[in-house]
């Protein structure tokens, strides 16, 4: 299993688009030279899996040679399974940082809830591993990843250069799909309040059986200039600090005054 020298920093890389996706290959290229890279990713696309884990069926993993000599493992599980397996079965110590992506498609605003990319990063954060999820606003398999590679390198190198990194650091980074020279900067944001106006399109398959296909339109209700959606619409990279503590502290204080009793 993977081992690094005591001085060597370990970079765990995963994703939800699968181990053969262009996104993860570009993520690996972006951080070469920053530490010992270990790739653990799903053997097939797992988009939209959220924080799902595999229960009641076996998990399998095997070593693959897909990254020019960099140690890599593919698993039959979800993105979160990949992180769990990496920490428990592959690495001899916790990685110094976990990077997830580069996702093909946006994970801003409400997307973070459904995202396998961000759930993998969140799982690592729960384990006390600083983590970053990267997404490009381009769903195409042939998307131009060169600008993303540059942004990834800038952000990761700055984070890893810090003397002490918060072990629960969790960042959701989204990158506009434009040439690098057109990117106006990196903006620290809050998550926009947005959702999908969803509908299930009813269809019939060749056997005459009814099935449903999820469709929908993205709607942003938050027009503030401090949101990830606004930053991306104005050609900036959005960086949202995220946390796995879902407690609503404002409501908690209110409820303590209204319904709490001893």
Show which residues each predicted segment covers:
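Short, Asp-centered acidic motifs that coordinate Mg2+ and/or phosphate
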Residues: 97
